[in-house]
Design a protein with these regions (language model features):
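Glycine-rich segments within core transmembrane alpha-helices of 12-TM secondary carriers
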Residues: 141-165, 187, 373-383
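Cytoplasmic helix-loop-helix junction between adjacent transmembrane helices
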Residues: 111-148
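Cytoplasmic membrane-interface "Motif A"-like loop-to-helix N-cap segments
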Residues: 77-89, 302-315
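C-terminal transmembrane helical hairpin of 12-TM major facilitator-type secondary transporters
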Residues: 307-355
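Conserved MFS/SLC helix-loop-helix module at the cytosolic interface between two early adjacent transmembrane helices
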Residues: 67-106
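Extracytoplasmic gate region of multi-pass secondary transporters
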Residues: 36-37, 237-295, 349, 353
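Helix-breaking motifs and short loop linkers at transmembrane-helix boundaries and internal kinks
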Residues: 48, 80, 101-107, 118, ...
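A late C-terminal transmembrane helix in Major Facilitator Superfamily
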Residues: 362-394
Length: 440
């Protein structure tokens, strides 16, 4: 076989081995952190949670997630992805199940905080893990193959959650309790499966032939040697100025993205006056639209190579959608604005994480990715909390969405300014992808 044939076969085998399993884990990751948005349709009234209490509880997850993300990713780089991702999945699944016993706002806050602590490091850990297996020119498509689980978790989870809400009375449990129990158990099982299924590095992959192992190992070693900022320690990597600049766009994404995600079912029901089950189906349709954009965004990002430009475009969708949610009447038009907003996620996510993995290598990459994710993810606390507080105190969420749209616009301008500083060009002989001279 020619070298290009070896490359094609190797990357296909790596993709088929790793991406479906990580994709499944990621679906439940998102399902267990965001299923309170569906549970809230029933839980808030039963437990008498105010808008402010729900918003704070939804967001407090991200405070602990942010605090423990960097140390979690450093441990992953030391002990290997197989064991650490398994630990994360098992503990978050058990804590997700424990949400069914919540009765007071304080208990709600405590379990959400512990859930964030348990899940800390999963997403940046997966990004780092992919950077060990996928060359830069394949990475956006690999990332898109994983994070398409974000909208699909809602496409599947919203109707499933709506159905589980209908189990009220079965086993003397409320429907929202069944929701947390049923959706929390699978990650525990997947965590144990990860111990047997995942492989830490290409050099250890017995499921690849010797020729395939040699190709991917040498290719990844070559990329590590050519890394733009070849920091030799995690602490030195954290001083890279571009990493700190990248925090703002990600913070903007998390603030408006999580703010919208946790409130979407309630906003849809308020706008259309639908039942809980019908609301869940409509929410699923919104995320289905976003899911269809993921593979297209990943292919386009790899083809043109303009990572920062694509990231800015994603934030522009968030901005336009946020303005629409704020200003349009509470009708189907507001639901369409929510759909426009959610389309920004695949465009942003498939490109953004290619930038830090190009800047850093090894444990430095693990630390850098975790730094961006941990600080940026605090937006997941502020977004839902701000919407809930303003909704309760002013009776409207329009001001909150206008402010979040402005933050998204600021993040887009930062990405545009970063294009020259993070230039990325695909290899001329990349199979199936035209060479590009555009910047990242």
């Amino acid at each position: 076989m020619t070298e290009q044939d070896v490359e094609l076969v190797t990357m296909r085998r790596v993709s088929l081995r790793l991406l479906p399993f990580l994709f499944l884990l990621y679906i439940f990751c998102w399902l267990d952190r965001s299923n309170i948005s569906i549970a809230a349709l029933q839980m808030n009234s039963e437990l008498k949670f105010s808008s402010a209490a729900f918003g704070f509880g939804a967001g407090v997850f991200f405070l602990s997630y942010s605090l423990f993300e960097v140390p979690s990713n450093l441990i992953l780089a030391r002990v290997g992805a197989r064991r650490w991702l398994a630990r994360i999945a098992i503990t978050w699944g058990l804590l997700a199940c424990s949400m069914m016993w919540v009765r007071t706002p304080l208990q709600f806050y405590a379990v959400r905080f512990l859930l964030g602590m348990a899940e800390a490091g999963f997403f940046p850990g997966v990004i780092y893990y992919l950077s060990l297996w996928f060359p830069a020119t394949y990475r956006a498509r690999a990332i898109s193959g994983i994070i398409i689980g974000i909208p699909l978790s809602q496409v599947l989870g919203a109707p499933l959650g709506g159905a589980l809400l209908g189990l009220t009375g079965v086993g003397h449990l409320s429907g929202w309790q069944w929701l947390f129990l049923v959706e929390g158990l699978p990650p525990v099982l997947l965590g144990f499966a990860a111990l047997a299924y995942l492989t830490d590095r290409p050099e250890d992959a017995r499921w690849l032939s010797t020729q395939q192992r040699d190709w991917v190992s040498s290719r990844m070693q070559l990329e590590r040697e050519q890394t733009v900022a070849a920091h030799d320690s995690p602490l030195r990597a954290l001083g890279h100025p571009l990493l700190w600049v990248l925090i703002l766009p990600y913070f903007a994404l998390c603030t408006i993205g999580y703010g919208a995600t946790f409130w979407t079912p309630l906003l849809v029901r308020d706008a259309l006056g639908t039942s809980d089950s019908a609301t869940a189906v409509i929410v699923g349709a919104i995320y289905l639209l976003a899911a269809l954009v993921y593979p297209l965004a990943g292919m386009l990002s790899d083809r043109i190579g303009d990572r920062c430009g694509m990231t800015a475009l994603g934030l522009a969708f968030y901005c336009v959608g946020g303005i629409g949610v704020a200003l349009l009447p509470h009708t189907i038009l507001r639901v369409l604005a929510l759909a426009v907003l959610q389309i920004g996620n695949p465009i942003f996510m498939t490109s953004f994480w290619c930038v830090p993995t190009k800047l850093l290598k090894g444990s430095s990459a693990a630390a850098g990715i975790a730094l961006i994710s941990s600080i940026g993810t605090t937006g997941g606390f502020f977004g839902p909390s701000i919407i809930g507080y303003l909704k309760q105190t002013t009776g409207s969420d329009s001001g909150a969405f206008l402010g979040l749209a402005g933050l998204a616009l600021l993040g887009a301008f930062v990405c545009i300014g970063l294009r020259q500083a993070t230039a990325f060009r695909p290899r001329p002989n990349l199979i199936g992808v035209a060479p590009s001279s555009q910047s990242a």
